Every structure is written in C-alpha cells, then in structure tokens.
Amino acid sequence: MSQQASTELTIEEGELPTRFEIELEFVQSLANIPYVTYLLTQLQLWQDPKFKRYLKYLEYWHEPEYAQCIVYPNSLFVLKLLNTLFEGSTVNENGVLEGCEHVPRILQTQGTQWMNEMVERWRE
C-alpha cells in the first residue's frame, strides 16, 4: 500500500460517524413515511426479528437527554407507532416474524394522512 493510500485510509476512518450519529440519523429518517414504507415493503424488514429488536432498542431516544437532539420530533411518534404495531408478533420456526403482516399495509394506507397531520402539528 502506498503512503498516499495509507493516509487516505486514515482520514476516512477518522471521518466515520459515531454510533450515536448513525442511530440519530436513522431515528429521524422514520419521520419520512414513504421511506419507512420502502424499508418494510421492498426490503421486507417487517418480517425480520432483528429489525423489531432494533426498533425496540431505539426507544431510548424518547428520553429527554436524547430527545433534545431530535430535529424531527414526529420520528419519535413513528418509532412508537412501529413498536406498537410490532407488539405481539412472534418468531416462527423459520425465524420470520408472524402476526405483523398488517404493518406495511397500514403504513401504505394511512401514512399519507399521518404525514399531513404531522405537518399540521408543525404549523401550530
């Protein structure tokens, strides 16, 4: 490896986002209902138990010390909504979530309404 490549690699490593930054960005992306719908439908994440656990883990963003970093507070509403919708789902023998098949459909049918309501709350 050349000296220049080594220097570039070091610089890139120093610019990697922290776990905090990654999780903050992801939580805030939940305010974008079309993006959440994409994750659930196109990537089939609604069937993945790891995704359910990750959303549950992210609940700590509701704590005041973390919530103060949130620019899009509606993302916390969507996080809570998703965790509520996934509640009661179980993992079958194939390692796939069952009991949450309705989640993508709910977001597709009501997501636009929720986004409009979020915008209205911002205006108040």
Swiss-Prot record:
| Tagged with keyword Zinc | no
Q: Which InterPro entries does this UniProt record tie to the protein?
A: Med31_sf, Mediator_Med31
Task: Give the protein's biological function.
Answer: Component of the Mediator complex, a coactivator involved in the regulated transcription of nearly all RNA polymerase II-dependent genes. Mediator functions as a bridge to convey information from gene-specific regulatory proteins to the basal RNA polymerase II transcription machinery. Mediator is recruited to promoters by direct interactions with regulatory proteins and serves as a scaffold for the assembly of a functional preinitiation complex with RNA polymerase II and the general transcription factors.
Check the record and name the Gene3D superfamilies matching this protein: Mediator of RNA polymerase II, submodule Med31 (Soh1)
Keywords tagged on the record: Activator, Nucleus, Transcription, Transcription regulation
- Membership in a protein family: Belongs to the Mediator complex subunit 31 family.
Broad class of the protein's primary localization: nucleus
Q: Which PANTHER family match?
A: MEDIATOR OF RNA POLYMERASE II TRANSCRIPTION SUBUNIT 31
Where does it localize? Nucleus
Instruction: Describe, as the record does, how this protein assembles with itself and its partners.
Output: Component of the Mediator complex.
Quote a single Gene Ontology cellular component term: mediator complex
Q: What are the GO BP annotations of this UniProt entry?
A: regulation of DNA-templated transcription
Q: Which GO terms describe its molecular function?
A: transcription coregulator activity
The entry's protein name is Mediator of RNA polymerase II transcription subunit 31
Q: Which residues form the signal peptide?
A: none
Gene for this chain: SOH1
